[in-house]
From Swiss-Prot:
Family, as annotated: Belongs to the protein kinase superfamily.
Region (Required for homodimerization) residue spans: 933-976, 1331-1406
Record's keyword terms, sorted: Cell junction, Cytoplasm, Nucleus, Phosphoprotein
Stated name of the protein: Inactive tyrosine-protein kinase PRAG1
Mod. after translation: Phosphorylated by CSK on Tyr-253, Tyr-365, and Tyr-413; Tyr-413 is a primary site of phosphorylation.
GO biological process, any: regulation of Notch signaling pathway
Length: 1406
């Protein structure tokens, strides 16, 4: 933890004492509170608020928050949600008044996340607001807003969050709380974070109790917050007031105390305590502190009133009375509450601990980006820890592992809702903060109305909302600011990791959807998390992938790595495991390590509060994850014992992942990226091996996805009650209450804890964690958690540049750590992979997920998750690269790169986000579908083996499933972090620096410059300066469709003054523009500036112009490339049409080409930045930068058309949506739908331009083949109805020419009814590229039925060849998976004889 500070002896009481009956006593533990006795000493003196002296959270016996199994004997309440008392270091608020009160010597602002006990009358979930005790200016917010659409309603009113933000000097300040969950507050306050909650009435209670206990711990506070304490008697030892609701709710909650010497934090803490009491019944989970909610001027927004229930009873006044002492108490209380979490907020007393993830992230990702803004707090959104269940775990924020190691400071995560951050307040690790005074103003200080944390973090400019006005959430992980480890992490909703440098992509928000989908994790959490994530995303760095300990016991101490400060926080896995909140350490600073949205960043954090919480917990706990490793019983042991349970938990987690499927993927992608990031960080390498091994999951993955989804494993025995007291230094899982919840010695952080987690993600995460602080990912055991996505995607680091680059200071990702695939993993039938580490020693083989970041797929498709992207252990997975073998065969095997990448173990692209998938990534469909063991699956495959036809039929089915998984894996590989949506606003303008003075591309509507973001140095971005006058483009916005590989992604647009020199043609010399000039030369004009991820090197028009000679010299190769470009165009247009969008301006100038080479090398090479680069090829961050700086630079691309890069197929991006139209039918407006239903067909078809894009695509075929637009050459065609014969012929230069000619005629059909659709055009192009050829189908005397049989056999043969090709590429490090491989996989995975027949007829081959 931060330093163990002497607390007053009161801490010995430990608020949990009153609930001791719910705890399980373990040797060496206090018989009253069940915390380690050493913890008591640490947690003492609630009365004195010593900012710096907050003790590490006392190890309270973890209460099963979610694991009902664990609850046995642990909590009287059926479920105890982990309560997270986050005590962010005080943030110096822009408003000095907020922190003026130094009188609170212990100004420790604490964010207390607690679950309102179910018993207490809780406001509706909606009603339950999260109270954020921020800098209160004495303003009390109305409780009414507590019910906020935020999604609190979504979340069971189980948790309330008390954010002790910056407390004003006056005790009265405590009174003011703003419910985090009020949306309107959000708007006002820039989205205070709301948290997803899981429904856990008893958990709420326990959380409440913990909160009360925490409050009680601070004797100073206990008087005032008596009611509060009452409500949380179990937790509040000193104030053992039993609140009806609090009593039974002994649920562990993590208390993260950020102590800031002399900071007003203490006051905040005290307020927090009060607030806690106040919210007693509050249901809000602190998991996602939406910036709006928390970050808004905490002081301003509805503070006290927002917590009607117990909160009210406590009354703000009571709080103020004990404010000063209470703060301290709160810190103590937080420590106590941490008992529930068992992590005790890895930096129990450190302010940094306030955000489990922040600390964790910061320390973990210190190397990622030592932004000068370490002060920036992690986003409260970040802390949007995990869903309520996870809450507890996340609640125990783990101090950043590294910083923690270095110092005791607890990183703080602050969420700044408003982009207008008054001043970035360094949020340092707790210890730092403690050392520095509250004045240092943890990032949490309210700046303006937004949390100072965000402002402090300086991320203030980052706005989650695309709208400049929207505040951006900034997660500032300041761990060791003194050490120059100041890192500012933007938590991005989409990236569960949340430490990604890149702004959290919006995808996280989309992932929010995931969240929604997953077991209704809690809208508020999602929302707030999304908000905070989105806000923070811009700053998000690749966090260490949260270790998801998939739902299985988190055996591996995450802290094994030098991260010695493993934040024990999630040791609570017990809670977490049972609550699933323990998903292990989510190292990502993202938010609180919201794994759920993919996190966290990876959307996990947001999208799946439930899941997010796990990662969040994971992040926090991961930091100091040791709790599981702790203990008497290694988690492994527990894993073995509880394999089944783990499986169930896993299944739960997995199931959730599955539910979240695609969204999860994006999350998982982020996680995967994170993992590489992890690897990239130096620590990662250090921890990588050990960590990954320790993180290896021993448990068996549920045999089948559905099983995983549906059944939730019994929560592991009360292992979830790990009150890890993570000393930054010790980084041991203190009190992994799970087995023997004795405090683990710091050595534990070095210990490998094997995770029985089924999700490889966790492994990757683990790797990351190791690098960070050695926190290993935990499994989310809790069935409740099961719904959450485990964040399996965590291991996607390599794929996601965002995550990766932040992961280390830009260290090359460790890449694939050894890709260790256990035989079990590689065996076709083996569902379980052994981690490569011996740790798990579980019966099931472990896959060394950490070794291959992509090892864990969070792929929705279980099959995908077979192996980390690098090695697909499962037969299918491993066979993914099979195609490579036949790279020589036919065009359909064009790309070797893909396999190499994937095979290139480190390849980020391979990040499989389906960690759950990984668990179930079985070779066979049966493995996918069947819940039975691999033995059963294998038995089914081998049954009737004597029949050749039956065996071939089974093989065909296996190939089909394997290819489908390969498609998804390739998507993760090439999309990398791009699946996450990012949002920048004008406040982020100063973060960007041009890498070259010359534009990299001049397109039809804009000039592009390659730039880097100071917050995400590993990734490259394109700064698009629109040429059109500002009034016309001010309303510019990319289509509101999900992120797609071939659609330009708008990461934020705003009006900026741009020097006129930058608007000149790329050929004209430019004055050096080292950074986007905020103070441009005299000549400047207002232009709309768009930040995009894809850095184009030329337009299709440039490509056609530069390749005229090559077309004549090598017509076959050139026209084949044209087919690929057209195929990508069709893919993008098809995606747009699915969402009712018609582009209406398709021309060569609006089609951008981006380098899309993936390095096949095993090293960090896995990411040729081109395609992934924009997204953030995780490991490629290093490579991404080069592409950005060099290859992506304007001159480099076009200059060497025939260079090695030119041999790689470029990625085509559709841009310029100024003329785009959206079909009216796509609106949910019922009235509009009714009116549309009454329109005549000719009106509807005319208004929708149904075949508009098809027609323009036909013209593009002519232009790409160096032919003029036929309607320009033959004007008469426009004046009359023309026939195909009237169109000019295309020269027949290659075997592709006749097919392209026929396709152009079909697309230029004058009658729109006869004109083929874009989907049919896509299939025709696929048929042209990969067959079947004329010779196969033009056999005399064959009936159509016989032809269908022939085509079926042809498809099976091509699939087998593709699998072999991928298999070869997997072991050939010189070759990687290429874009052509992915496109071919898409074709073969969906091919069916009927569609092939139709395409052959259109091509007139039949």
């Amino acid at each position: 933890m931060h330093q163990t500070l002497c607390l007053n002896p009161e801490s010995l009481k430990m608020s949990a004492c009153s609930d001791f009956v719910e705890h399980i006593w373990k040797p060496g533990s206090c018989k009253n509170c069940f915390c380690l006795r050493s913890d008591h000493q640490l947690v003492a003196g609630p009365p004195q608020p010593r900012a710096g002296s907050l003790p590490p959270p006392p190890r309270l016996p973890p209460r099963p928050e979610n694991c009902r199994l664990e609850d046995e004997g642990v909590n009287s309440s059926p479920y105890s949600k982990p309560t997270i008392a986050v005590k962010p270091t005080m943030m110096s608020s822009e408003a000095s008044d907020v922190w003026t009160e130094a009188n609170l010597s212990a100004e420790v602002s604490q964010v207390i996340w607690r679950r309102a006990p179910g018993k207490l009358p809780l406001p509706k979930q909606e009603d339950a607001p999260v109270v954020y005790l921020g800098s209160f200016r004495g303003v009390q917010k109305p409780a009414g807003p507590s019910t906020s659409p935020d999604g609190n309603s979504r979340c069971p009113p189980a948790y309330t969050m008390v954010g002790l933000h910056n407390l004003e000097p006056r005790g009265e300040r405590n009174i003011a709380f703003h419910p985090v969950s009020f949306p309107e507050e959000k708007a006002v306050h820039k989205e205070k974070p709301s948290f997803p909650y899981q429904d856990r009435p008893s958990t709420q209670e326990s959380f409440r109790q913990k909160l009360a206990a925490f409050a009680g711990t601070t004797s100073g506070c206990h008087q005032g917050p008596g009611p509060l304490r009452e409500s949380l008697p179990s937790e509040d030892d000193s104030d053992q007031r039993c609140s009806p609701s609090g009593d039974s709710e002994g649920g562990e909650y993590c208390s993260i105390l950020d102590c800031c010497p002399g900071s007003p934090v203490a006051k905040a803490a005290s307020q927090t305590a009060g607030s806690r009491g106040r919210h007693g019944g509050r249901d809000c989970s602190p998991t996602c502190w939406e910036q709006g909610k928390c970050s808004g001027p905490a002081e301003q927004e509805k503070r006290g009133p927002s917590f009607p229930k117990e909160c009210c009873s406590q009354g703000p006044t009571a709080h103020p009375s004990c404010l000063g002492p209470k703060k301290l108490s709160l810190t103590s209380e937080a420590a106590i509450s941490s008992d529930g979490l068992s992590c005790g907020s890895g930096s129990g007393s450190g302010s940094g601990a306030s955000s489990p993830f922040v600390p964790h992230l910061e320390s973990d990702y210190c190397s990622l980006m030592k932004e000068p803004a370490p002060e920036k707090q992690q986003d409260p959104g970040c802390p949007g820890v995990t869903p309520s269940r996870c809450l507890g775990l996340t609640g125990e924020p783990q101090p950043p592992a590294h910083p923690r190691e270095a110092t005791q400071p607890e990183p703080i995560y602050a969420e700044s809702t408003k982009r207008k951050k008054a001043a970035p307040v360094p949020s340092k690790s707790q210890a730092k903060i403690e050392h520095a005074a509250a004045a240092q103003g943890q990032g949490q200080v309210c700046t303006g109305n937004a949390w100072a944390q965000k402002a402090a973090s300086g991320w203030g400019r980052d706005s989650p909302d695309p709208t400049p006005q929207v505040s951006a959430t900034i997660t500032v992980m300041a761990a060791h600011p003194e050490e120059d480890h100041r890192t500012i992490y933007l938590s991005s909703p989409d990236s569960a990791v949340g430490v990604q440098w890149p702004r959290g992509p919006v995808s996280q928000n989309s992932e929010v959807g995931e969240e929604e989908t997953s077991a209704g994790q809690g809208l508020s959490s999602r929302e707030s998390h999304a908000h905070s994530a989105s806000e923070s995303k811009p700053k998000e760095r690749p966090a260490i992938p949260p270790k998801l300990s998939k739902s299985s016991p988190v055996g591996s101490p995450v802290s094994p790595s030098a991260g010695g400060p493993p934040v024990s926080p999630l040791a609570d896995l017990s809670d977490g495991s049972s609550g699933g909140s323990s998903i292990g350490p989510q190292p990502p600073s993202q938010g609180p390590a919201d794994p759920a949205p993919s996190c966290r960043t990876n959307g996990v954090a947001i999208s799946d509060p439930s899941r997010c919480p796990q990662p969040a917990a994971s992040s926090a706990s991961e930091q100091r994850r040791p709790r599981f490793q702790a203990g008497t019983w290694s988690r492994q042991c527990r894993i073995e014992e509880e394999e089944e349970v783990e499986q169930e938990l896993l299944s739960h987690s997995w199931g959730r992942e599955t539910k979240n499927g695609p969204t999860d993927h994006s999350n998982s992608t982020t996680w995967h990226r994170l993992h590489p990031t992890d690897g990239s960080s130096g620590q990662n390498s250090k921890v990588g091996t050990g960590m990954s091994k320790s993180a290896s999951f021993a448990f068996e993955f549920p045999k089948d996805r559905s099983g995983i989804e549906t059944f939730s494993p019994p929560p592991p025995p009360p292992k979830s009650r790990h009150l890890l007291k993570m000393n930054k230094s010790s980084s041991d899982l203190e009190k992994v209450s799970q087995g023997s919840a004795e405090s683990l010695s710091p050595s534990f952080r070095g210990v490998h804890v094997s995770f029985t987690t089924g999700s490889t993600d966790s492994l990757a995460s683990d790797s990351r964690t190791c690098s960070d602080g050695g926190p290993s990912s935990e499994l989310a055991h809790s069935p409740t958690n099961s719904g959450k996505k485990l964040f399996a995607p965590v291991p996607f680091p390599s794929g996601s540049t965002e995550d990766v680059s932040p992961s280390g200071p830009q260290q090359p990702p460790p890449l694939p750590q050894k890709k260790i695939v256990s035989r079990a993993a590689s065996s076709p039938d083996g569902f379980f992979w052994t981690q490569g580490s011996p740790k798990p020693g579980t019966a099931s083989p472990k896959l060394n997920l950490s070794h291959s970041e992509t090892n864990v797929h969070d792929e929705s498709h279980f099959s995908y998750s077979l192996s980390p992207g690098n090695r697909h252990h499962p037969v299918f997975s491993s066979s993914d690269p099979l195609e490579k073998a036949f790279k020589g065969s036919g065009h359909w095997l064009p790309a070797a790169g893909l396999a190499g990448n994937r095979g290139g173990c480190g390849s980020p692209g391979l990040q499989c986000k389906g960690a759950p998938s990984a668990s179930s990534s079985q070779l066979s469909v049966s493995s996918q579908a069947s819940t039975g063991s691999t033995q059963l699956q294998l038995h089914g495959l081998l049954s009737n083996i004597s029949s050749k036809e039956g065996t071939y039929a089974k093989l065909g089915g296996l190939y089909t499933q394997s290819l489908a998984r390969l498609v998804a894996k390739c998507e993760d590989l090439f999309m990398g972090g791009q699946k996450k949506e990012l949002h920048f606003n004008e406040n982020n303008w100063s973060l960007f620096k041009l890498t070259c003075n010359k534009p990299c591309c001049d397109s039809g509507d804009a000039i592009y410059y390659c730039a880097t973001c100071s917050e995400d140095p590993g990734s490259t971005y394109a700064v698009k300066i629109c040429k059109a006058p500002e009034p016309k483009t001010v309303s510019y916005c990319s289509p509101s469709v999900p992120v797609h590989f071939n659609i330009q992604q708008d990461c934020g647009h705003f009006v900026a003054s741009v020097p006129s020199s930058m608007l000149s043609s790329p050929d004209a010399p430019k004055d050096p523009v080292p950074a986007l000039p905020t103070h441009p030369p005299a000549q400047e004009q207002d232009c709309v500036v768009v930040i995009t991820r894809e850095v184009p090197h030329q337009t299709a028009s440039d490509f056609v112009r530069d390749s005229a000679a090559s077309h004549q010299a090598e017509p076959e190769a050139y026209e084949r490339r044209v087919c690929f470009l057209l195929l990508q165009l069709c893919n993008g247009l098809e995606h747009l049409k699915e969402h009712g969008i018609i582009h209406r301006d398709l021309c060569l100038e609006n089609l951008l080409l981006v380098h899309c080479t993936l390095q096949a090398g095993p090293g960090p090479a896995p990411a040729p930045a081109p395609a992934p680069a924009p997204a953030a090829a995780a490991p490629p961050c290093s490579s991404a930068a080069p592409p950005a700086g060099g290859t992506l630079s304007p001159a480099a691309g076009p200059a060497s058309p025939e260079g090695p890069r030119e041999k790689q197929l470029p990625r085509l991006i559709i841009s310029n949506f100024l003329k785009a139209k959206q079909k009216p039918g796509g609106t949910p407006n019922l009235q509009q739908k009714k009116s549309q239903a009454r329109l005549a067909p000719e009106i509807v078809s005319a208004s929708q331009y149904r075949k508009f894009d098809e027609f323009q695509t036909g013209i593009l075929i002519y232009e790409l083949l160096h032919q003029p637009n036929p309607f320009e050459v033959r004007a008469q065609l426009r004046e009359r109805d023309y026939r195909q014969e009237d169109l000019p012929p295309l020269p027949a230069l290659s075997l592709y020419s006749p097919g392209l000619q026929q396709l152009a005629h079909l697309l230029l059909e004058a009658d729109p009814i006869k004109r083929i659709r874009i989907g049919e055009a896509k299939r025709v192009l696929q048929c042209l590229l990969w067959g079947p050829r004329r010779e196969l189908v033009q056999q005399p005397g064959t009936s159509e039925e016989a032809l269908c049989g022939t085509l079926h056999n042809w498809i099976d043969m091509k699939r087998a060849l593709m699998m072999m090709k991928f298999a070869e590429k997997a072991v050939d490090r010189r070759r990687g998976v290429e874009l052509e491989d992915w496109l071919c996989c898409q074709y073969l995975a969906s091919a069916e004889p009927g569609a092939l027949l139709q395409s052959l007829k259109l091509l007139q081959l039949l």
